Amino acid sequence: MAIFGVLMPAINIPRLNLLDFIGDDHVKQHAFSQELGKAFNDTGFVMIANHGLDASRIDELYKQIQAFFSLPEESKRNYEIPGLFGQRGYTGKGREKAKDALTPDLKEFWQCGQTVLDDDPVRHDYPENIMVSELQDFNDILREVYAQLEETGKQLLRAIARYLDLSDSYFDKHVHNGNSILRALHYFPITDPDSIAPDAVRSAEHEDINLITLLIGASADGLEVLTRDGTWFPVKAQGEDIVVNVGDMLQRLTNNVLKSTTHRVVNPPRELLGTSRFSVPFFLHPKSNMDLTCLDSCIKEDNPKQYADMTAGEYLDERLREIGLKM
């Protein structure tokens, strides 16, 4: 299966090597954190190489995801659990929309979340992950990928903390056993284009809710990023890199020093509407009690405080209601 990574010559999204930060060379560590912070300030996006998942694991991941979404509709609906607000298991077609959008996105998805292995009291706050009885390999690969992307995300947050002149460990306690989500997305085929709403798209323009998002390359084109001057640019394909972008929680915390960038997934040309697109983002969330009050160091005379004080849990609840997953 051809997996699409990222290369966007029309916009400056830098490519960074994570080994530069997790190695012992302090000069490379500093350069990595500075380049990461600058990218998140300029565009909100960066490409990361050597993130811990090789091509064979990514291929296996997409193989299992395709297998799940190929199950009969009735079988998939058995894993859609009322009351979980899409945070675990299956969410069917037409259930989620972008903030302020009227028409649901043309997608279905599966989500798995945190498994707390220690005695952290937060373990009582999270629902158990749903296991697919027909596909044990699907369960296994999602757990493996979740663990790897969570570790990669923690390293990136340490680099961000350094860029912000915070302790490298600033985010550690907040994301240990955090409310992070791995989402397997299927943008399903449209066999009758005339049957969908004129404004229906695979994923309407939006910003992510969380701290940072780590996106494994998709199976087809379609992802577009909105630049600061209001121009949409496609994210094209290359290699095994992942795309990492700033979410709204990090933007709030840094008072817009690090920017959450608007993005979307557009429909393919009409002749390709009958094809699927698969994608796997990892939404790195903190624990719900993390204080998102703007950092004092990010409040300046020319950048006054932009946001009301709020916890991560309060903000997540607000956004889940806005996108239609929670009533």
What is each of the regions a protein language model found here?
Residues 2-327:
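Peripheral, non-catalytic segments flanking oxidoreductase cores
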